[in-house]
Amino acid sequence: MSIAAAQISPEALYDMLQLFDAQPWTKRLHEELAELWALCISRNQQLLLRELIKDFCMLDADKELNACKEFNTQIQDWKLNPTNTWVVAVANADEIDGSTAGLQKLKNKVHPHEEWHSRFISNIPSSAEKINNGDNVILFDDFIGTGKKMARKILWLKKLLLQRGVGDFKIFCACFTGMQFGIKHLIDESNRPVFASISLKRGISERYVGDELTNALSVMKEIEGQLGETYRNKKLVDYTLGFEQSETLYCAANDNCPNNVFPILWWSIRKNKRPFKTLLQRAG
């Protein structure tokens, strides 16, 4: 279906041309954009979505490569070396998630490769069998949202290691991208250094102020009112403005969308129970 076939208004067509220019990845999603604009019941809703999508951070190949390079630099700044340092994905045993995928991309970017390649571990249970007293551990996730998940993973790793009598080690945290408020929470909660190549502000609350903020939040909730109350056994009320109201505008290219993202971009059921073609995809 072409944009013209969608019979959208001239104003909506102008919005999309702006988005195609600002966010080239949206060009292949013109049908999804047309559906999203058609879902809106006011011009104010369309204008808010236009501005938010223009601010969206899509982690493409170039940004990802830069994040890997900056991670490598951060390791040097932390003065860590491969003889006693482990880089551990925060995944559970036998789980494939964003942390394991990101770790694989990091594996050949940390120098010197021949010394570091064996120091990457794909999940926390496996790492708990290898970490010893005096070691350094970099817990890695591709994205830090609220920071609470990483804080829980730190406690879990400590518990597993104590079962082996290992208690003298240092933990560092790292991600490709993180929400500023989540990174701050993690630092405050764990007192650990945290690296993020890209740090993001909340999409609405940390962009608008005063009456504009109040209006923007109200408009977004109006838009969310067009979505189904439940989806895959989840309740929309638990994800309004994104999980724990994170207001996230981020996804890695061709990857699973974090639940911290505004649900209007991934919640694929309308309130009339009909399917909705979303800009982003989320499994789980």
Residue ranges and their predicted role:
Residues 86, 136-138:
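Structural motif
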Residues 95-135, 145-152:
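Short, glycine/charge-rich flexible loops or terminal/linker lids adjacent to PRPP-binding catalytic cores
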Residues 2-86, 90-99, 155-284:
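PRPP-dependent phosphoribosyltransferase catalytic core
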Residues 141:
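Active-site flanking residues adjacent to catalytic metal/cofactor-binding acidic residues
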Residues 144-145, 173:
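A short glycine-/small-residue-rich loop at the edge of a beta-strand within enzyme catalytic domains
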